[in-house]
Amino acid sequence: MNQPASAYFIEERHDPNETHTLSVLVQNEPGVLARVIGLFSGRGYNIESLTVSETENQKHLSRITIVTTGTPMVIQQIKHQLDRMIPVYRVVDMTLTGSSIERELAMVKVRGGGDHRVEALRLADAFRARVIDATTESFVFEITGNSSKISQFIDLMRPLGLVEVSRTGVAAITRGPEGM
């Protein structure tokens, strides 16, 4: 039997979640980051990664880079709500520009002895990770790259004696001569 046409009947859709990197240019003043985070937490949106820094070329402005997931409609809603905030100057969905560069840095501490030590160094070389601290019992590696490369490196270090990881979060910038 067909459903009656009604303003109250909403066809259920199951759009897949997508991951998007948003770059948000804001006034660098107290409370702005808390307001942006409040927008996400108040509506139940998840933040996968968050980085914030004052921009070099425009003083008193900061760039917030947020990696978030949601359906296309949720992502659109997040961008619209960010755009309406008073201290926000611009919101760019780096995922949609198609020509952006994303990088992350991680420091990875691994216990290292015997064969595990040799294997950890071999993997670090393969991933172009640098040794930034070494003792007879452990290493600290520094690795940069996209998030999946860093996650893969961490996964390979687990069986070798992974102790701890500190990740910076994603930084993103568009390619070419134009700015944000």
Kindly give the residue locations of the regions a language model identified:
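Long, contiguous binding/interaction regions
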Residues: M1-S62, V67-M180
